Curated annotation (Swiss-Prot):
It comes from Haemophilus influenzae (strain ATCC 51907 / DSM 11121 / KW20 / Rd). This is Uncharacterized protein HI_0940. Keywords: Membrane, Transmembrane, Transmembrane helix. It comes from the Bacteria. It is a single-pass membrane protein.
Amino acid sequence: MTIQKGIITLTILIFISGLLTAFLLLDDSHLSFFRAQQNQRKHYVERTLQLQKMTATKKQTACLDLPLNNNESVKQISIALEGSTDAIQYFLWCERMSLFKKSPKKGDNQGALKDFVTDEKLAYFRPHFSSPPRILNANKMPKLYWFSDSQAEVEINGTVSAVLIAEGDLKLTGKGRISGAVITSGNLTLDGVTLAYGKKTVVALVQQYSQWQLAEKSWSDFNVQDE
C-alpha cells in the first residue's frame, strides 16, 4: 500500500510539474506575442508621425507641381515614405483654378466676355497677362493679350497665334490674320484683318492660364479613385 501511494503521489507530482511547465511555456509565448505587438504598434506610430511631418511640408507645393497640359479639374496625389515596405500613405486632393469658365469654340466671341472669363479669378491672373503692343507681329508661341481700355485698337501684321480679350470695344486693323480667338465685352471691328478659330492655340492658352491648388480639407489617409 505504501508503495502504491508513493507511485500515485509521484505520478501526481509529475503531472503537476508537466502542467506548470506547459503553463510557463504558454505564458512565455504570450509574452513574446505581446512584445511583438507592442514593437509593431510603436513602429507604426513612428512611421505615421514621420509621414505626417513630410505631408505637412509637401502639401504646400504638391499641387503646384502638377502638369497643366490636360483637361482635369481635380486630382488626387499620394504621399508615402521612400523605401517603406508598409502600406502607410496619405492622400491630398488638388483642384484647378482657371481664368476661363469654358474654352471658346469659335474665333469671334463678340460681347461674350462674361460667358468665358471668371471675374473672381481675374485679379490672380491679371499680372500674368502680356501687355498688348500697338502692333502684333507674326509669332510661333501662342500668347494671350488683355485689353483693359474701353476702346482699344491694334494692328495685326502677319499670322498671330493668340487669344485677344477686351473689356470694351476692340478694333483690329492691318492685313494680318488672327489664329485663335477674340473675346470682347463690347464691339469687335475687323478692318482688313481675318479671324480664324485656332483650336490648338485656344486649348494651350486655356490650360496655361490655370493653376493647381490644394483643396480645402483634402488631407486624408484613405484612397478615393478618380472618377
